């Protein structure tokens, strides 16, 4: 590859894994927004909050994809899966925020390892 600039296969793989994590977080936040948008839940401020969080994670993934391409890597997204979410109790709001905090901590830890 002519435009590859000091970009090892390991860097490419690890960045692709991180891109997948960002998209997984985006999907998870999107699912939370969808849950709080249900007519039997109807917490519109949380819909807005999680919709913005979803967009933010998607934008992060896009930035990493551009960087990967710029360095001569090939973007491959494997294992893009949202976190399993089960919200059907009075503690839904607390559980949603715990999930969001855990997602942010996990992504931050992976970034620190990169």
Predicted ranges, named:
Residues 18-21, 25, 32, 80-114:
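Acidic/histidine-rich alpha-helical segments that form the ligand environment
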Residues 7, 39-45, 87-92:
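Juxtamembrane/interface segments of multi-pass membrane proteins
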Residues 14-17, 21, 42, 49:
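Residue preference for a single heptad-register face of alpha-helical coiled-coils
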Residues 35:
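Conserved helix-loop functional segments at active or binding sites
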Residues 30, 38-80:
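Conserved alpha-helical segments that form or flank metal/cofactor-binding pockets of metalloenzymes
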Residues 1-19:
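Disorder-to-helix initiation segments
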């Amino acid at each position: 590859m002519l435009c590859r600039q000091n970009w090892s296969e390991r860097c490419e793989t690890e960045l692709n894994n991180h891109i997948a994590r960002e998209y997984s977080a985006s999907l998870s936040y999107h699912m939370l927004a969808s849950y709080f948008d249900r007519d039997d839940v109807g917490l519109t401020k949380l819909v807005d909050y999680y919709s913005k969080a979803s967009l933010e994670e998607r934008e992060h993934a896009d930035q990493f994809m551009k960087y990967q391409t710029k360095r001569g890597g090939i973007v491959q997204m494997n294992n893009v899966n949202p976190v399993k979410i089960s919200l059907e109790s009075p503690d839904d709001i607390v559980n949603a925020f715990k999930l969001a905090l855990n997602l942010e901590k996990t992504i931050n830890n992976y970034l620190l390892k990169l």
